[in-house]
Amino acid sequence: MKKRSKDLLSVKKLDHEAMEIIQDNTIDIYPWETTYIAANNLNWKPRPVFQSYITYTPYLDMKNANFYNSVKSPSLILWEKKHWGGEVESIDGRYLLNDEPLTLFQILNHYRPVYENPSFLLMRRADYELLSQPTIVLQGVYQWNAWLNVPNNRTSTNHILRAKTNIKRTSSQKLKKLLYKEFEVY
């Protein structure tokens, strides 16, 4: 059993260059592969809900976002790129970046890439906010199955374009959400 555990952990051993950057700094793992902690004896400082796929409510997302926006946040984040479904797929075929949008905004706002290899991206906390304050560039009521012209966002490197939607559900969709799960939106 000990040998089997050691063999499984060896797959998540980090290369020398990554370990030189990490040293004994605090680190969190995103989105969920905590095996890196045990395999490399890292100084783990996890967010409150430490596996992104279980951050399924706005409340839990806000807990993680507040953590990354605080002095309690780790010095580094190891963002694993190779997991089931590819780089941007979460469980159940969900889009990873939709799992916790508030948390993701805080990661992008406070962390910048310092090292990358085919398996992961290592990000270091910046001393200042990296993104400009959000502004509304377009709002309105739009129809399904119709193209929407997206504003050009190439004027600055510290801007990202985000969309906030409010989808009105039919009575049957509300019932399905209550009894089973949300309907798919693409």
Language-model features: where?
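Solvent-exposed, flexible loop/coil segments flanking beta-strands in beta-rich domains
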Residues: 124-177
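Extracytoplasmic
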Residues: 1-130, 167-186
